Swiss-Prot record:
Protein known as: Nucleotide-binding protein Desal_2385
Coiled-coil annotated residue ranges, if any: none
Similarity-based family: Belongs to the YajQ family.
Protein's job: Nucleotide-binding protein.
MF annotations from Gene Ontology: nucleotide binding
GO (cellular component) term, any one: cytosol
The organism of origin for this protein: Maridesulfovibrio salexigens (strain ATCC 14822 / DSM 2638 / NCIMB 8403 / VKM B-1763) (Desulfovibrio salexigens)
Pfam families (alphabetical): DUF520
Gene3D superfamilies: 3.30.70.860, YajQ-like, domain 2 (3.30.70.990)
Length: 163
């Protein structure tokens, strides 16, 4: 029986490249002259910590990150911006989490969406992915279109298509 997996993955190298490009742009921008701005990527915890001078600079860096992530073909919906907190050195700090893997709630929403479509396919949750199996390849392609059109606010990839 044909099947495929719905996953949410991030290319770690592209994330690293995007963060480095943002740092290069910050070095060349006039409005960041004389302002200490730090961006640290922690690959183990999948977080980016951002420390800069004021609220306007945080917004500018956020816009730069979204632009560079889009340029590097990493979906900006995989960025989860935390709240802005003041630091002891009169600067502002923001934690950005990289969403990777499908959590249980989102997986349940996907399965519910697929079952509500009345297509003759089965969806099963496997750790941080959803496996969809069906008799017809056309039904599987309909499921891909259905999930792509849904507003689940998360980037999905469709892998392991088996016939």
């Amino acid at each position: 029986m044909p099947s495929f997996d719905i996953v949410s993955q991030i290319d770690a190298q592209e994330v690293d490249n995007a963060v480095n490009n943002v740092l290069k742009e910050i070095d060349t921008r006039y409005d960041f002259r004389g302002v200490n701005t730090e961006i640290d990527l922690n690959k183990k915890t999948n977080t980016i910590s951002l420390v800069t001078g004021d609220e306007m600079k945080i917004k500018a860096v956020k816009d730069m990150m979204i632009t560079h992530f889009t340029r590097r073909k990493v979906d900006p919906r995989s960025l989860d911006f935390g709240k802005v907190e003041p630091t002891s050195s009169a600067q502002l700090k923001q934690e950005i989490k990289l969403k990777e893997g499908i959590d249980k709630d989102t997986a349940k929403k996907i399965v519910k969406l697929i079952k509500a479509s009345k297509l003759k396919v089965q969806a099963a949750i496997q750790d941080d992915q959803v496996r969809v199996t069906g008799k017809k390849l056309d039904d599987l392609q309909s499921v891909i279109a259905l999930v792509r059109d849904s507003d689940l606010d998360m980037p999905f990839q469709y892998v392991n298509m088996k016939k």
